Amino acid sequence: MIVCPNCNHPNPDGAVQCEACYTPLPATSNCPNCGATVQSDAAFCGQCGFNLHSVAAPAATVATIAPDVPVEVPPLANPDPLLELLQPNALGLDPVANENPPAPAPLPPTAVAAPPDATPVVVEVTPAPPPPEPVVVEASIPTPPPEPVAPPEPVPAVEPAPAPETVVAAPPSPARTQLQQITARLVHVQSDQEIELPPSLSVVHIGKPNDRIPPDVDVSGFANSEIVSRVHADIRLEGDAHYIEDVGSSNGTYINNLPLLPGNRHRLRPGDRISLGKGDLVTFLFKLA
C-alpha cells in the first residue's frame, strides 16, 4: 500500500499516481531484509525496522560507475590500394619499423564495484567517557493512592404511569347527515314568503342595500321596509346554534315582542318571532327544516 503524501489516501502497490487527487506517487522498492514494499526515500523499513541507508550508498555507487567504452571513428575517406603499394613501407619490410613496433593503445580501466561485504570498514575507537558523577536525588514521599469511592447506588427509574388510552368516539354518521340536512329559514309573516339562510355563511347580515355592509337578507322588497335600517341585525351560526343580535338599528329589534338591546344576543329556537322595527310591521318566524 502506497500512502499519498498530499492527501494521505491509501493506494494499491504499483500505483503511479494517487487515485483521489492524482498526485504522482513516490517510487517503491523492496526491503532487502524482509522483502516488504517500502518507499524509495524511506530511511527504515516499516515492517522490520531495517536501516535502508546502509545498502542505499553501495547500490548508488554501482549504478553510477560505468566503464568507458572507446568509440571507433571511421576514416573520412577510403585510401586507394594502388597508392599503398607504391609506398616504401607498404609491405612492412622496414627493419626499423619491425624492431620498434608501436605499442598498442591501453584499454580503459573497467571500474568494478566491490561488493558491500568486501569494503573495509574503519572503526574509530574512541575512549569511553568517564562515568558521570552520581546525582543525589531526594526520595520523594509517595502519595497515598486515593481512597476508592463507592459508586452511588443506582436509583431505580420510576416507570411513568401508562397514559390512559383516549378513545375518540367517532360521531355517528346519521347525526352528521341530519345536520347537513337541517337548514334555517325565515318566514315573512305578512306575505308568508320563506327566505333560506345561506348555510355557507357564519354571519348573515339583515338590512337593506348600502355602501358599508351589503345585506345577505334584503328586506327592501317587503311592505313597510322603511322602518328597517340599512344595517339592522345579524344572525350568527356557531356550531348547531343560531344567535341574533341588533347591530345599532334606529327602530330596534324585538324577539317575541321583547326588545333586544344592542350588544346583547338571543339564541334562536324554532318558532321565535323576530320583528324589525316598531309596530310589528316587518316580522319573521324562525324555522329549522
Swiss-Prot record:
It comes from the Bacteria. This is Protein FraH. GO terms for biological process: heterocyst development. A zinc finger (unnamed) spans 18-48. Keywords: Heterocyst, Metal-binding, Zinc, Zinc-finger. SMART domains: FHA. InterPro entries: DZR, FHA_dom, SMAD_FHA_dom_sf. One of its GO terms (molecular function) is zinc ion binding. Putative heterocyst to vegetative cell connection. It holds the Pfam family DZR. It comes from Nostoc sp. (strain PCC 7120 / SAG 25.82 / UTEX 2576). Residues 204-260 form the FHA domain. A zinc finger (DZANK-type) spans 4-49. PROSITE patterns: FHA_DOMAIN.
